[in-house]
Regions:
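HDAC/HDAC-like amidohydrolase catalytic core signature
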Residues: 1-260
Length: 260
């Protein structure tokens, strides 16, 4: 089932949660922000399984592993505190980052390298100073989610300066992309994080069928190497990537760079 109507944030704020619509089609629009993410039989079990996968990877790292990779399906970075969408129901990376920051009292950085900006992760941590969000993505002037992900979105309140968006032009290739990631490493280091959570989207790949960037398999390896240089425990969680014939080798290349 999919929503038939959507409600603006202003309308949702004026109504109590107890006043959500009675019909299922209306309620879906209350909790969803777009049309590409239907609910089906088994959706909850799959989404909860993705969270469990992410939390298992997190626990492996907390128990002493240098890194762990979680093959999360469905992905999570578009899900906000109260809305699902963009194929995402629960924000796997945000759940891990919040859990570690709130229970261990340490700072965490979420590095999102998916082609699409993680609007949900940004919304969740936008006014917090214990979790930094860094996203490298297609320019939202042309790329989903369109209304968020611009470079001037830097965080609010005590979180100001802890949100970094790096949008790219179409056909951006390895050197420009990797250099941009290298440039932000000093800011990540200065933040003082004790763990990094990577939202690993591979839809920046040169032959991805629904995106328009030109990162190669070797470019992914170079990105992993940069993250390795931070020397932080790393939880790597799968987000997007739609050239399914190349997805495995691209994941492998990124993890080889990380030294996983």
């Amino acid at each position: 089932v999919t929503p038939e109507v959507f409600y603006s944030q202003a309308l949702r704020n004026k109504k109590s949660l107890g006043a959500e619509p009675a019909s299922i089609s209306g309620r879906l629009g209350w909790w969803c922000f777009e049309t590409t993410t239907p609910l089906t039989e088994g959706t909850y079990e799959a989404a909860r399984g993705a969270v469990d996968t992410a939390m298992t990877a997190m626990q492996l790292v907390l128990d002493g592993e240098k890194s762990a990779y979680g093959l999360c399906r469905p992905p999570g970075h578009h899900a906000t505190t109260s809305l699902y969408g963009g194929y995402c129901f629960f924000n796997n990376a945000a759940i891990v980052a919040h859990h570690v920051a709130s229970t261990r009292g340490v700072k965490v950085v979420v590095l999102d390298v998916d082609y699409h900006h993680g609007n949900g992760t940004q919304e969740i941590f936008y006014d917090r100073d214990d979790v930094m969000y860094v996203s490298l993505h297609g320019d939202p002037a042309r790329a989903y989610p369109y209304t968020i992900g611009y470079a001037d979105e830097v965080g609010a309140g005590k979180g100001r300066g802890s949100n970094i968006n790096i949008p790219f032009a179409a056909r951006t290739g390895d050197d420009v992309y990797v250099n941009a990631l290298a440039d932000v490493m000093n800011k990540i280091h200065a933040f003082g994080a004790e763990m990094i959570v990577v939202s690993l989207g591979l839809d920046t790949f040169i032959t991805d069928p629904i995106c328009d960037m030109s990162v190669t398999t070797d470019g992914f390896r170079r990105c992993g190497e940069l993250v390795k240089q931070l020397g932080l425990p790393a939880v790597v969680l799968q987000e997007g990537g739609y050239d399914v014939d190349k997805l495995g080798i691209n994941v492998q290349s990124w993890l080889v760079g990380l030294g996983a």
